Amino acid sequence: MKVPSPSVREAASMYGTAVAIFLVILVAALQGSEPPESPFPYRIPLDPEGTLELSWNVSYVQETIHFQLLVRELKAGVLFGMSDRGELENADLVVLWTDGDSAYFGDAWSDQKGWIHLDAQQDYQLLRAQRTPEGLSLLFKRPFGTCDPKDYLIEDGTVHLVYGILEEPFWSLEAINTSALHTGLQRVQLLKPNVSVPALPADMRTMEVRAPDVLVPGQETTYWCYITELPDGFPRHHIVMYEPIVTEGNEALVHHMEVFQCAAEFESFPQFNGPCDSKMKPSRLNYCRNVLAAWALGAKAFYYPEEAGLAFGGAGSSRFLRLEVHYHNPLKIEGRRDSSGIRLYYTATLRRFDAGIMELGLVYTPVMAIPPQETAFVLTGYCTDKCTQLALPPSGIHIFASQLHTHLTGRKVVTVLARDGREREVVNRDDHYSPHFQEIRMLKKVVSVHPGDVLITSCTYNTEDRKLATVGGFGILEEMCVNYVHYYPQTQLELCKSAVDPGFLQKYFHFVNRFNGEEVCTCPQASVPEQFATVPWNSFNRQVLSALYGFAPISMHCNRSSAVRFQGDWNLQPLPEIISKLEEPTPRCPASRGRSPAGPTVVDIGGGKG
């Protein structure tokens, strides 16, 4: 259908009071299938001002998401959508806009220059537009996958949501360019696992670990650290659940929070309450790294399986806890107070199993490096069959949650389980991973790991903005590739990671010298980062390094909780032999789509259907 287009002068004359009144009285103008009976369990603010709020629920049976978008201060329209990394270009969008006479709701997309186009396949279905005391509420749905090349495939991992505010009418959807709008992005996991809530113990108690009335700095990013401690003589307990406590009014400010337990070998830790990067922060706080709880925007309460709990308190456990809160304050608001934190639910009735946390992936070492100017360079770390055979109990372990972690150049992380040389299943995968959005995620399905299994963790990096090689290490400009898996029963195996054998890396430096006129320093006193810094990064040297990581022996770290390796020969270990890999997931098209509209849905001023 052709959308009517009044003249520019007519549109301008209609703008103002008429547009505002028209959009405010938009009440139930559209009729469609009713939303599911279940409420909207997930809710996030989209913009820092809190004028846009998104709620949603997930139907795995229908493979559909129902969205509810609340627009508190509607001007001339709004756009919402998804893109690969949060760009407004090449985005999958749904737009509510007005031309001055009528309003339209339509599935759209933006091109590489930010111009918006109506999608020929209308996959966003508007179910209801309703004025509420809070603002205009838009209820619509969309399948996970549509098989429309202009649409975003909604997957299990991180989704980069984008939004835009239309402040004036547009005579046509094609007249809108995202660069002229007030826009932004928000990261979230849309496809939350449908995990049933386990029974909770009758003697359950709570403990709140909260920031003590923090005056949030008026800068875009702040990591705030606060040290607290358990009561004297606090006995051993099991954490069975935790949930966020966000100060009312700060929902758009608190991005993520973590509670760490400090190292038991220190009898005391100094008190601290301030920015984590402060020069006044005691260095001993760097030994508070054992994660007890982690929450990120959009996440709900985290439950441990009925048969397991995370132990804390008692002998051999530190009394000291560190709370870390990430404040995201792009508007640089001054004077805001915050007492957000995490509420721990714990029981003195210990469950059958202690839960454990194991590190998978790559060792923090500069021998694993990413050349500069790479768009998708892959590094892989192994937890080998030799290590799991030695360190896991005969009945194996059961992974129920996972937290992926890289530094700034990480773009994708996946861990797969292999058995008898064949990849069997994915433990966790995030194809749109962002280092700015990290949370402990419940797995849809518990993954059982048997002695002799292999766990393979691969990270994909983008270093297009780097001039030198990015080496592995603890620094924020260095890189990591880690999956912290949460499992039960707890074992002595705390770290199962690898890195290329250092001797073979030196052979790489000597080898590329033959083709580069001794440009790479291989002198004994040169460090590995210094050697990488002198490599001329032509295509040959890049390919050889990638090939080296794909065949060279590895140094295996099969470590106990005491940071001591299990007994055995762990150097110059061959890479696990994988004879069969999992196929890449194939998007599923909706079985029956029904009749989608040929164009946008039109709503006239009187509330009738267009």
Curated annotation (Swiss-Prot):
Whether Membrane counts among this entry's keywords is yes
Q: Note the superkingdom of the native organism.
A: Eukaryota
Write down the Gene3D superfamilies for this protein, in alphabetical order. 2.60.120.230, Copper type II, ascorbate-dependent monooxygenase, N-terminal domain
Give residue spans on the Intragranular membrane side.
Answer: 31-610
Q: Which residues lie on this side of the membrane: Cytoplasmic?
A: 1-9
Regarding tissue, the record states: Detected in adrenal medulla chromaffin cells.
Q: Pfam families from the entry?
A: Cu2_monoox_C, Cu2_monooxygen, DOMON
Main localization category: membrane
Q: What's noted on cofactor binding?
A: Binds 2 copper ions per subunit.
Protein name (record):
Dopamine beta-hydroxylase
Q: Give the gene that encodes this protein.
A: DBH
